[in-house]
Every structure is written in structure tokens, then in C-alpha cells.
Amino acid sequence: MAVGKNKGLSKGGKKGGKKKVVDPFSRKDWYDVKAPNMFQTRQIGKTLVNRTQGQRIASDYLKGRVFEVSLADLQKDIDPERSFRKFRLIAEDVQDRNVLCNFHGMDLTTDKYRSMVKKWQTLIEAIVEAKTVDGYLLRVFCIGFTAKDQQSQRKTCYAQQSQVRKIRARMTDIITNEVSGADLKQLVNKLALDSIAKDIEKSCQRIYPLHDVYIRKVKVLKKPRFDVSKLLELHGDGGGKSVEAVVSSEGAVIDRPEGYEPPVQEAV
């Protein structure tokens, strides 16, 4: 057994010393998330990212982020028919402190989807892949349920398999025509208004009455080559950049974009 004192413990040692606490948020910047001009609400929130340091560029870490927003928040509408639709927006480019997003998909909330599934009715679903005019390949999921006849005394309202096949074929034809005959902006407007589902419900009345017909989900499978000019055109004003007026030393008013930082002077 060694006899002696432990000098590391008596002096406190390196492990016992106080460490300098650095706030992690001091190395981060806030960026405004901008939605396309097809929605009424342009700024949907803010996002954090580490500040540019060396080869680690902040914009590279922002591109590809996906934001999920309710349609009611995007359209500034309290209608309950809009609150259960969720739109997914993906960050494609960064201009100054603005993150410009594009459509990346749509989905229904889980509680809405599960509340529609009930007994004594037939669930009919169609999955369609179609390409828009501007080259976006989409997979569209449509769902509908058979409706009970008010004059019928039966408890159930099941459809025959031949009727189910006809309704599914009608769903496929309508979705294919609507998607292939419009660009992405026009299609998003149709999804927001739910016009495709209403056309399907109206067209299938002769085969079998339906209710709760919705475009349940939309996935973006393939996109065309990225073009900055098309994204800026989709945002209209380039992402809603705000310009602040700065008065120079000579008294002239200078317009500078938001987030402007003066260059570093090498010599005084």
C-alpha cells in the first residue's frame, strides 16, 4: 500500500476546476420562414441555425428543413373544415434572413382520419400517381365512405364490389385529370379549397351515395431541377423582404434589406 498524499485531490485538480459556461444560443441566428404567395399568411414562424463559421455555412443547414402548418393558420381562417388539414412546406432557398419554402405534401390530422372510420359502411380508397404540368410527380391518396339512404330502414349501407371498383376508377380518373392539367400552384389552391374531393363526391352519386370524401394525403415523389427564378416567382416579392430606411451621414435615405450587416473595415 502506497503511503503519501494525493496531490491532485489536495489542490483541487483539473477536473475539480470551474468550467466556463457558454450559452449555446449565442452562436445561433433566427431566420424567418416564408410560405409561398398562394397562402394568405406569408410568415409562418422562425427557425434557429448555427451562425456561419468557416466552411459551415448556415444556409446549407437550413435547406431541406420541413415545416408542418395547419391550413387554418395559413389561410387565417377559423373554419373547422380547414383546421384538420396539414400542409408540409420544405425550405429550398435562403435570401438574407428569409427561408423560402415550397409545397412538400399534405395530410389529415390523425384524430380526423380515425373519427371517419365507422361500422356499417364501406370504406373506398384510391391511390393515384400523376405528374403536374411543371414536372412534379405526386402520389395522391383519396378516401370516401358510403352514405346511408335516409328512406332505408336498414342499419348498414354496404356497397357491392362492382360498385366499389367503379367508384375507385372514377376517383382515379378525376384525380389524374385534375393533377395532370394544372401546375403546382393551381393544384395547391384546389387542395386548399377541397374542390377535387367535392367533384368526386358529386360524380359518384349515381353509382352509390358517398360522404366524407377527402384527399387524405399528398406526397411529392419527384421534383424538377431546382430553379431559383421559379421559386422567387412563386413567392412573388422574393419572400416578403422588408426594407428599412437608413439615413446616411450626408442626410440621404438609403434602403437596406432586413438583416444587413456592414462590412468589416480592414484599416482605420
Curated annotation (Swiss-Prot):
Mind listing the UniProt keywords for this protein, alphabetically? Cytoplasm, Developmental protein, Differentiation, Oogenesis, Ribonucleoprotein, Ribosomal protein
What Pfam family is a match, any one? Ribosomal_S3Ae
Q: Does the keyword Ribosomal protein apply?
A: yes
Q: Which SMART domains match?
A: Ribosomal_S3Ae (SM01397)
Q: Where in the cell is it found?
A: Cytoplasm
Q: Say where the protein is mainly found.
A: cytoplasm
Instruction: Please state what is observed when this gene is inactivated.
Output: Flies exhibit disappearance of the follicular cells of the ovary and abnormalities of the associated germline derivatives, leading to failure of egg production.
Q: Does Amino-acid biosynthesis show up as a keyword for this record?
A: no
What does the entry state regarding organ or tissue expression? Answer: Ubiquitously expressed in stage 8 embryos. During oogenesis, expression is located basally in somatic follicular epithelium and in the oocyte at the later stages.
* Disordered: annotated span: 1-21
GO MF annotations for this entry? structural constituent of ribosome
Q: Which GO cellular component terms, listed alphabetically, does the Swiss-Prot or TrEMBL entry include?
A: cytosol; cytosolic ribosome; cytosolic small ribosomal subunit
Q: Which GO terms describe its biological process?
A: cytoplasmic translation; oogenesis
Q: Quaternary arrangement and interactors, per the entry?
A: Component of the small ribosomal subunit. Mature ribosomes consist of a small (40S) and a large (60S) subunit. The 40S subunit contains about 33 different proteins and 1 molecule of RNA (18S). The 60S subunit contains about 49 different proteins and 3 molecules of RNA (28S, 5.8S and 5S).
Query: What's this chain's function?
Result: Essential for oogenesis; required for late follicle cell development.
Q: Give the family from UniProt.
A: Belongs to the eukaryotic ribosomal protein eS1 family.
* Classification via PANTHER family: 40S RIBOSOMAL PROTEIN S3A (PTHR11830)
- Tell me the protein's name: Small ribosomal subunit protein eS1
Name the gene behind this protein. RpS3A
